[in-house]
């Protein structure tokens, strides 16, 4: 409530002979006088008094302001805004309190601004309407505690979520409804989806769906694709979504050229950087990737405020000529970065992955790199960053994300090729409390051993690029199934990692464990018997990871290289130097529907100071499909026991393609070829057969992106075997990120 009483002299200035201030209790009189900008003896007209009124209300210290200038006496009557003690939210079930608090603007134990709070209530209503459930009623009431303190009670009456009963497509002649349902994120209600929310109607989700359909069609040559309409047929049972499409004709790439409006930019060699072949099927993804490649090259050459803009020239023969224009960009300043869709993940987790901040100058290349960094967190299915110009010098960045589950609670049992029958309990949360902290607790009991471990990792320590983690573990393994020994290990490790640059990360670690080999069979090889007993392993390690992948968890293109060394002997009984290497490349094939990967892994270990490498620290190439666990590598001639090796190399070529099954199953078929070997034993007193020959295998498998992680089963046949090798047709396993 605000008042401005008209002056006794409306058009002429009155001299102020006295100033009387009342109603201020917490706010000092000095503060009020500082806002007045009026002194005794000063002539004040109506427009000046109006300015006083505006300053007092703009301070947001007062809920009511009354001014009266009569007979030279300026009376300032104030009513202060109360102090907010607490905000209570009731009735919210579909949206967490943490997510609501991100939208509501308030600060406890601070001055309560009712107008600002009302605006945030409006924002909360909009968020519910677009992202959670429509027709949600939200109200609030102010509960006075005493004269100067209030509580606020927010009541949310969530409507029943609108269920998507069916999804239909019109105008699609090339791709079936089943294929297109795989493309979008909205899902039909199904018995396979009892507990999720993907089948709930959401405007925000539909916006993602529109973008995904456009990327899908234009990624497969349909340059003229358009979504002509989206019909929502609602009834008491839910809603039927009808996407009305215009597929258009299929185009291929024509001529590709690069031109520049800036004469000082050298572009003669830029066309060589474009990896688009004339005659290839038009692909909007390839257009964007090559634009980013050109932009990156230009940035490296010092041209920071340029952009690469594709221009299309379709012809009647189904070809699209493509021209990349190198243009000067006006220097826009980022006034605000808005983030939406993150109902669980804290804004700070996303903002710290942004290479641009508010008040920075806008750079398109940094926007693209920021999107990749956010995706690599592993918390989101989709990330879109759009810019909206607000005037000729400023813009707003809108970051829209679609969150994915980041935690699992698993109680399961089954059979694994490397552990036998097992029972497993695990809790994994990769985004603990929305902070990006990682917590893993795992308890596994198997016929061939047990594994108990707990790991905690915190990213961005002190808001830097440093990640720190620690773990403790106990594991034991019964190798008696192979006629050898029992093994147990208890210990822990600590690690820190640091980003040397955006795509290069350094990892440093220390581990300490007490390893025991016991219950050795009497006819076991002498090298195994000599390893018996308890030894202390104290080791430091480092690794470097060059990450040029589009997505660390599910890569579709790009490459990655990882190598490192582990040095044991910083105290303890065991002395060795171990080296590990992994490199892989990924590319989308078959019109972007499948992914071809080539991966090479290698490792080498050797002892020093007169020590050899114990059997517990050697490599066992159990990952090679077509061969049994302990199936290849050096073997004891007399007992046929596997001894492990000091060197291995394994190369894998694989293609994964989506299967024509219900989208809920999320199954892919994999076809692969592998070649590798395991060799080298430096501690042995017995006769050993050690073939250096390369083995190879070929096979196929099923890959399931399950709630418990990416699982797979493979059927493989060994093509080339070594003497004494053990083959196995079927293997089960869990897929780890690159």
Swiss-Prot record:
Gene3D superfamilies: membrane protein fhac, membrane protein fhac: a member of the omp85/tpsb transporter family. It is found in: Cell outer membrane. Keywords: Cell outer membrane, Membrane, Repeat, Signal, Transmembrane, Transmembrane beta strand. One of its GO terms (cellular component) is cell outer membrane. Residues 1-13 form the signal peptide. Residues 14-81, 82-159, 162-248, 251-329, 332-404 form the POTRA domain. InterPro entries: Bac_surfAg_D15, BamA/TamA_POTRA, D15-like, OM_assembly_BamA, POTRA. It comes from the Bacteria. One of its GO terms (biological process) is protein insertion into membrane. Its main location: membrane. Pfam families: Omp85, POTRA. Part of the Bam complex. Part of the outer membrane protein assembly complex, which is involved in assembly and insertion of beta-barrel proteins into the outer membrane. Belongs to the BamA family. This is Outer membrane protein assembly factor BamA. The gene is bamA.
